[in-house]
Amino acid sequence: MIFYIGSQEWELKFVTQEEMNREWETEFEPFIDGEFLLGLTIATTSTILINKDFPRRMSSVFNHELMHACIASYHLSKSDDTNKKCYTEEDICNLMEVCGDEYCRLVREFKPIIEEEKNAVQIKENRTTSTRRN
């Protein structure tokens, strides 16, 4: 699913843990066995990945990853300033000034889409559980 933050195109994907691990290893470093990710924002490809193996967490994970995407889109990352150790109150206020309205709009727009995906995953899980019992 394609969407925009400012003029930057982003893609939202719902993926399995296995797919998420592959993306992590491609972009960052080898994955440690037993670890898992609920979500991942890849600024270099403008992609947000949401782990569909955890349907109950999808909404909060999307909100979290969307903030990473907003920070990347508006070049507000503290990683851009190697001397900066954390965000100040002023930094956070500037972030909300620059992209707060857009962030809130996107959260509202994606809420029904994420709910639909979550419900589809839960229905599939319920069918799998019912099949195993029979």
Q: For each predicted feature, which ranges?
A:
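Post-HExxH zinc-binding segment in Zn-dependent metallohydrolases
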Residues: 80-121
